């Protein structure tokens, strides 16, 4: 069974050394409206852009690349 992007990102929460990806994971965890069941790049990207959760979408792109590599 494939992990959703949200499920994948939860392993980055409470990282020993904070970085932009661990900060994104924390923000996703705190956002009750985040599309937790989605595996769709466009859906998640649009949500993040509209929510203003990130200063730069390159953080999401980096996290998404790691997610794809891990699948």
Curated annotation (Swiss-Prot):
InterPro entries (UniProt xref): UPF0346, YozE_SAM-like, YozE_SAM-like_sf
Coiled-coil residue windows: none
Family matches, as Pfam families: YozE_SAM_like
Domain of life: Bacteria
Gene3D superfamilies on file: YozE SAM-like
Family: Belongs to the UPF0346 family.
NCBIfam families given in the database record: PRK13672.1 (NF010193)
Name under which the protein is recorded: UPF0346 protein BC_2253
Source species: Bacillus cereus (strain ATCC 14579 / DSM 31 / CCUG 7414 / JCM 2152 / NBRC 15305 / NCIMB 9373 / NCTC 2599 / NRRL B-3711)
Lineage: Bacteria, Bacillati, Bacillota, Bacilli, Bacillales
């Amino acid at each position: 069974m494939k992990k959703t992007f949200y499920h994948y990102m939860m392993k980055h929460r409470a990282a020993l050394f904070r970085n932009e990806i661990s900060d994104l994971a924390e923000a996703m965890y705190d956002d009750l409206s985040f599309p937790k069941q989605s595996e769709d790049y466009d859906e998640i990207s649009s949500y993040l852009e509209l929510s203003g959760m990130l200063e730069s979408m390159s953080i999401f792109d980096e996290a998404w690349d790691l997610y794809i590599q891990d699948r």
